[in-house]
């Protein structure tokens, strides 16, 4: 049986992070393969694993590496399948590995998750696979609910046990609150409800990056919709739009400021969420607040301002079961299409 996911470690010392990934994949009952191959010390082995794995039917690759973590990028060089990068903290708090993984050139994206977040790498892989496998999607939803319940239970297990003189534990007790999902519909002037990809731009100054996503999706003939909605200024509108577009397969958040777009999206859907961190007018970028998400809510982060790679990553995900799109994607990645 061909596994659905291949995990490649850059070194045996990365096994602790891989164990986080394997624990999730075992829980979700997703077949996987684990290999150790270095982008620098065994480049031919990396190539053979990726090429033969792709030809055999691997759907998603996960590259786990620290230091100058070029492994995920090396994997992306030899496959049209989605590649997830998990940077490992070895030195300088893992920032060297993070930048090596996320700042990939067009058209070779790596869907990077937070430093040491092997668990989120596996959850992201499951979200991708859940687009094509209803049983996996159901398990992703169950896992998502488990993370939600853990937060709710912490109120009883931690907060309710605090016995300070002036704390009012029974005020708005969490277990008694009724938490309902949004059912409101978005009332925009025009939306494409048949969109496979939804792009949400957090503010108008980030539209230049959003347009890069849109142009590349057009070249790949992927139907999409794009709106400018700030989840901080327009929270109700944001939730209504996500609810209205719930049948889309991929959500892309264009982030600046505190990167609330992609973070807000990933909590509202079980679909893959791609984050594009942007620079603001002061030259600050919001990479860290996009990528370093807590357990259970991965954001597939691409490089700063790299909207085109977000679109290519969408194409890689959607082409898993779409040979027509795969042909377009391969032409683009082989630079036969002039973007």
Swiss-Prot record:
One of its GO terms (biological process) is 'de novo' IMP biosynthetic process. It catalyses: 5-carboxyamino-1-(5-phospho-D-ribosyl)imidazole + H(+) = 5-amino-1-(5-phospho-D-ribosyl)imidazole-4-carboxylate. One of its GO terms (molecular function) is 5-(carboxyamino)imidazole ribonucleotide mutase activity. Substrate binds at residues 11, 14, 41. It is an enzyme of class 5 (isomerase). InterPro entries: PurE_ClassI, PurE_dom, PurE_prokaryotes. Its EC number is 5.4.99.18. Keywords: Isomerase, Purine biosynthesis. Pathway: Purine metabolism; IMP biosynthesis via de novo pathway; 5-amino-1-(5-phospho-D-ribosyl)imidazole-4-carboxylate from 5-amino-1-(5-phospho-D-ribosyl)imidazole (N5-CAIR route): step 2/2. Signal peptide: none annotated. Belongs to the AIR carboxylase family. Class I subfamily. Catalyzes the conversion of N5-carboxyaminoimidazole ribonucleotide (N5-CAIR) to 4-carboxy-5-aminoimidazole ribonucleotide (CAIR). HAMAP family: PurE_classI. PANTHER family: PHOSPHORIBOSYLAMINOIMIDAZOLE CARBOXYLASE (PTHR23046:SF2), PHOSPHORIBOSYLAMINOIMIDAZOLE CARBOXYLASE CATALYTIC SUBUNIT (PTHR23046). This is Probable N5-carboxyaminoimidazole ribonucleotide mutase. The lineage of its organism: Archaea, Methanobacteriati, Methanobacteriota, Methanomada group, Methanobacteria. The gene is purE.
